[in-house]
A protein has these predicted regions:
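RNase H-like nuclease fold core
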Residues: 1-45, 49, 53-60, 134-142
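RNase H catalytic domain
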Residues: 10-17, 53-131, 135, 140
């Protein structure tokens, strides 16, 4: 099965109450929207939580494309994480990587799946990205 996923995270204050949202679309164009919230978090933690939760809904043998408007998420999972692992989870400036717990969880999940990561510009009219944004924002208040 093939899936396309759009994810987003939001925070009211940083840190503060946060929400995440994901739009999951299968190859038959069936769409599932999921979202959640945390009372005290950061926008980056919500950006990481969204794909973790979305991937938990999909069988491991699926082919997946994930769209995110977060360069932190896309670059972290496709570029930076290899160096973090090599450097004992230290960033380029030798400080501990923030959100290590979520990066470890996301890395474990993504290694078990065929995933292509793509960046999409935020608030640029992409309907599914806008839906993910709305889900994340609305989750904060629900």
């Amino acid at each position: 099965m093939k899936y396309t996923i759009y994810t987003d995270g939001a925070c009211s204050g940083n840190p503060g109450p946060g929400g995440w949202g994901a739009v999951i679309i299968d190859e038959k164009n069936k769409q599932i929207n999921i979202s959640g919230k945390e009372n005290l978090t950061t926008n980056n933690r919500m950006e990481l939580t969204a794909p973790i939760r979305a991937l938990g809904k999909i069988k491991k043998d699926s082919k997946i494309i994930i769209f995110t408007d977060s360069t932190y998420l896309k670059n972290g999972i496709t570029l930076w994480i290899k160096n973090w692992e090599k450097n004992g989870w230290k960033s380029a400036n030798k400080k501990p990587v923030k959100n290590k717990d979520l990066w470890l969880e996301l890395n474990k999940i993504t290694k078990q799946r065929d995933i292509t990561w793509k960046w999409v510009k935020a608030h640029a009219g992409n309907i599914h990205n806008e839906q993910a944004d709305k889900l994340a924002t609305e989750a904060i208040n629900n």
